[in-house]
């Protein structure tokens, strides 16, 4: 393969990736779909108002569970990203002009969907002087303005580590400030060439110093070792990360990084236990966990761990903090049993 679907020539890394066939998923990478009344209501609202969410457009396997809790994720900044990560399906190309009306439209969508909790994520905008800091901040401000009973999580790029840009985002005061490290130092440059591991840790450190609840994510199965995962977890905790999600890499297509291994639920449980032992305020670990999965629940758990009262206008989120969730490793083990009999596939 030498030509991408959109007609351009493949990057060398894409050509190399395409030499490895798409991998077959193990038995524990499956989802149980349950359509509850809140999900059905959300679906009708989204269709009726022609709203757009990452949940639908990315085909997220957790949409039924998250929508049942009235949580949803929105992608801002356009369809093109100014950087390329080897695991990410978002198109890397020159971004579209900034749409200054987007924050209000997103806030109106949150209101129409009657969300309890919203996650905002988006593309990197190195083409803009402020790298998108105003956009990420304004979306939070507009959601809070129109939806005082909705929690907001802001999952942002690194803004090249520029303190003034980060400060602008901090001052919008999302309930959770999230920046995903995604992988371990040894393979970081190969997976995320336009980012820097230490810079990402510093972004989290600055947010924690500002007083925000902080969050990050690790994707497993891209070539890291168990020991490196533990070290990365410790790095994140030392940087002041409150909430950690841990997930399995699922390859979006042949042009993306091959899956190095399928991580078994037992190992996800080990990493969750290690993270809790380190002192993370909230942990979610499992193959189909995503960084925005049950985000309101994790925020409530983190606030309780920190000894802080959830604001009265968000008190309803307390009701989501207990019990197990469908995608946690412990739940998968109860559902499918031990996976030792299923071989770990390596594509090295």
Swiss-Prot record:
Signal peptide: none annotated. [4Fe-4S] cluster 2 binds at residues 81, 85, 88. It comes from the Bacteria. Its main location: cytoplasm. PROSITE patterns: RADICAL_SAM. CDD domains: Radical_SAM. It is an enzyme of class 2 (transferase). Binds 2 [4Fe-4S] clusters per subunit. One cluster is coordinated with 3 cysteines and an exchangeable S-adenosyl-L-methionine. PANTHER family: LIPOYL SYNTHASE, LIPOYL SYNTHASE, MITOCHONDRIAL. Belongs to the radical SAM superfamily. Lipoyl synthase family. This is Lipoyl synthase. It comes from Corynebacterium glutamicum (strain ATCC 13032 / DSM 20300 / JCM 1318 / BCRC 11384 / CCUG 27702 / LMG 3730 / NBRC 12168 / NCIMB 10025 / NRRL B-2784 / 534). The gene is lipA.
């Amino acid at each position: 393969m030498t030509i991408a679907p959109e007609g351009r020539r493949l990057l060398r890394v894409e050509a190399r990736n395409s030499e490895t066939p798409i991998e077959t998923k193990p038995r524990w990478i499956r989802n149980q779909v349950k359509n509850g009344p809140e999900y059905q209501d959300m679906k009708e609202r989204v269709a009726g108002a022609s709203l757009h969410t990452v949940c639908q457009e990315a085909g997220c396997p957790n949409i039924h569970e998250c929508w049942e809790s009235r949580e949803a994720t929105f992608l801002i900044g356009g369809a093109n990203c100014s950087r390329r990560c080897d695991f990410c399906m978002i198109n890397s190309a020159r971004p579209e002009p900034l749409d200054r009306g987007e924050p209000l439209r997103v806030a109106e969508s949150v209101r129409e969907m009657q969300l309890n909790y919203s996650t905002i994520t988006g593309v990197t905008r190195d083409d803009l002087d402020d790298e998108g800091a105003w956009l990420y901040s304004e979306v939070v401000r507009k959601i809070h303005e129109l939806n005082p009973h909705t929690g907001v999580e802001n999952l942002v790029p690194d803004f090249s580590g520029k303190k003034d840009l980060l400060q602008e985002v901090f001052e919008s005061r999302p309930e959770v400030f999230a920046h995903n490290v995604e992988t371990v130092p040894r393979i970081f440059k190969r997976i995320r060439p336009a980012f820097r591991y230490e810079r990402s840790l510093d972004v989290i450190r600055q947010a924690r110093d500002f007083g925000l609840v902080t969050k990050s994510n690790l994707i497993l199965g891209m070539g890291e070792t168990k020991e490196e995962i533990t070290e990365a977890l410790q790095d994140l905790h030392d940087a002041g990360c409150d909430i950690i999600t841990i997930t399995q890499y699922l390859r979006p297509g042949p042009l993306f990084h091959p899956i190095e291994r399928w991580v078994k639920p037992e190992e996800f449980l080990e990493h969750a236990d290690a993270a809790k032992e380190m002192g993370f305020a909230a942990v979610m670990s499992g193959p189909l966990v995503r960084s925005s999965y049950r985000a309101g629940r994790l925020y409530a758990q983190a606030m309780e761990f920190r000894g802080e009262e959830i604001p009265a206008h968000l008190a309803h989120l307390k009701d989501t903090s207990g019990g197990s969730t469908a995608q946690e490793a412990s739940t998968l083990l109860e559902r499918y049993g031990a996976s030792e009999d299923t071989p770990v596939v390596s594509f090295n």
